Amino acid sequence: MELKKSPDGGWGWVIVFVSFFTQFLCYGSPLAVGVLYIEWLDAFGEGKGKTAWVGSLASGVGLLASPVCSLCVSSFGARPVTIFSGFMVAGGLMLSSFAPNIYFLFFSYGIVVGLGCGLLYTATVTITCLYFDDRRGLALGLISTGSSVGLFIYAALQRMLVEFYGLDGCLLIVGALALNILACGSLMRPLQSSDCPLPKKIAPEDLPDKYSIYNEKGKNLEENINILEKSYSSEEKCRTTLANGDWKQDSLLHKNPTVTHTKEPETYKKKVAEQTYFCKQLAKRKWQLYKNYCGETVALFKNKVFSALFIAILLFDIGGFPPSLLMEDVARSSNVKEEEFIMPLISIIGIMTAVGKLLLGILADFKWINTLYLYVATLIIMGLALCAIPFAKSYVTLALLSGILGFLTGNWSIFPYVTTKTVGIEKLAHAYGILMFFAGLGNSLGPPIVGWFYDWTQTYEIAFYFSGFCVLLGGFILLLAALPSWDTCNKQLPKPAPTTFLYKVASNV
């Protein structure tokens, strides 16, 4: 169905509002899971590493399943996926209130809620991109702050609900709030031409002659497949001879579709043999597409900046994600009294993440700022801030570090810019999908690793030194790969003839 031109406004602003609210509702609880993490530790008595799997799965599963989420949205549309995912998120949260043990939470909260969030994120971003072209950056920036605002509000909301209604009541109420996603999804009107008539089914006898005849030698493979997919609507008569039971096909002659079907078994065998041949060609084509995908993936990793970027995003999520999950428990382990809490530390991380997304996004638009180096700077500063957490023994210092970490976590808003500069716009979708997979892997592994360090040492010191080292290492690897001096050194060495699979982008970022 033909789509309208992106209106860059109008109903698009309704899409922005409901997408913002959708991300607010679905990501509020998973991102503020640190409040629930403390309650689960007390309720189930499991180790910190095992309990941390609940929150890490909720954040990582959606990213790990990003290719499946994209396929669902492209196949069914943003509105149905949003409504279905709203049921998943709400149902997973409500189901978690009846969890008898931590393993049940792995499924109900970690997998069900996490997968629902991944589907919702893909749906909101996709439909926003359809409605906006010139103002796409602004629209995406606005909806992306929904998750950060959700983190800010849900951290305080969940703490209050736990105090008044207990852990189970909190999850039931938060799940009920998530049902509002269904209303948001109903407003996600598909962008399609209102005056575009629905396609009519054509009777076989009314098909044009060009679909009744097929000359194998005059068509390329893609045309063969297209005609095969339209299927045959009429009998074809072949000039062939039967020799030793094998058919030797020269060409196909057109036969009027109104002619009655022949009863000769030879014609039936010819048709079966012909369609079998084209099915084999279709299978070969699909295999060729798979080989091309693998070849493009290998080509991406031949780009040293992209290879460094994938290592950096993996290490960043292993080390940078745990604070949003564990900071409340860090304060409790540092003997910070609850009376000193002016605002939950997770709320500070959330509001500063929203500020960081906006300010870093604005800085990335300045031509005199190198986006890749800006991203590297956020990684290095974040690594240093993580290493400073063990020295924070008061609410004020923990709040200050939480604000710094939250602001730097806003570098997610410039990550697509960095990816585009690294591989080019034509490779963005492929490259971004790979990077998001490794980001999900890091999100899933980071908090349990930090929790295991605590279970091993009974202190968060080594755990956050490890987190800071991971982020620092990722930043320095990316910095070294992007330095123009590396290209200068490589130019002095004999190099093979350039191919389409080699990219020199570091000096152009």
Swiss-Prot record:
Which residue ranges run through the membrane?
Answer: 13-33, 53-73, 80-100, 102-122, 137-157, 164-184, 305-325, 342-362, 372-392, 398-418, 433-453, 462-482
Q: How does it sit in the membrane?
A: Multi-pass membrane protein
Question: Per its record, what are the GO molecular function terms?
Answer: carnitine transmembrane transporter activity; creatine transmembrane transporter activity; monocarboxylic acid transmembrane transporter activity; symporter activity
Question: Hey, which stretches end up on the Cytoplasmic side?
Answer: 1-12, 483-509
Which is a Pfam family this sequence falls into?
A: MFS_1
**UniProt record, GO biological process:** carnitine transmembrane transport; creatine transmembrane transport
Catalytic reaction list = creatine(in) = creatine(out); (R)-carnitine(in) = (R)-carnitine(out)
Kindly list the GO CC terms recorded for this protein. plasma membrane
Keywords attached to this entry: Cell membrane, Membrane, Symport, Transmembrane, Transmembrane helix, Transport
Q: From the Swiss-Prot or TrEMBL record, state where the protein is found.
A: Cell membrane
Coiled-coil spans in chain: none
Q: What does this protein do?
A: Extracellular pH-and Na(+)-sensitive low-affinity creatine transporter. Also functions as a pH-independent carnitine efflux transporter.
Q: Which family does it belong to?
A: Belongs to the major facilitator superfamily. Monocarboxylate porter (TC 2.A.1.13) family.
Q: What is this protein called?
A: Monocarboxylate transporter 9
**Quick one: which gene encodes this?**
SLC16A9
